[in-house]
């Protein structure tokens, strides 16, 4: 049976009354894959780089066939009108280092990067916000890095862009219907990689 490791933020694991795509992905994978994941939000790219070796200790890292990962929504977060936490060049560097770390820790695994999903800008209140322009910019950085490093990419931004507003739980998270649709797309992309042995 194939072994899959999931690394991502609250779009993966849920938050504030939402489920996230992971439970739906696990359900679709029953009988075909065993999914492993950290029991915490993996946050921004530098946080994932710092902690992924600890998360790898909780799974059979040497037997993982596919790592599905995303970092981005935490990276583009603006607080009190400031710029995103890491500037673009730092996001680029952290992704490169994260890919190298994943390849070190999961030596037999193929990698699948998920771009960050769009936000509903009008729903932000308070000092923090995200913009779709920032998300597009950082997704473009990620796609460029992954292409250079030979990592497969699933454009979840494109998948979620035309979701009905009823599938949005809040400014960034999804209802079960939205999370199920994300899981369907991830399952299809992941299965294609596993079936081709990439």
Ranges and model annotations:
Residues 1-97, 133:
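Conserved SGNH/GDSL esterase-like catalytic core that processes O-acyl groups on lipids
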Residues 106-110:
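A short helix->loop->beta-strand "cap" motif at the edges of active sites that frequently abuts
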Residues 98-102:
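Hydrophobic positions in alpha-helices of CheY-like receiver
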Residues 119-156:
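Substrate-gating cap/lid alpha-helix
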Residues 48, 52, 167-198:
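Histidine-centered active-site loop/cap adjacent to the catalytic His
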Residues 76-86, 120-127, 166-167:
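Surface-exposed, active-site-proximal loop segments in enzymatic domains
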Residues 71, 115-117, 156-158:
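Short, well-ordered beta-to-alpha junction loops that form the rim of enzyme active sites
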Residues 83-90, 127-137, 170-178:
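Alpha-helix N-cap and loop-to-helix initiation/capping positions
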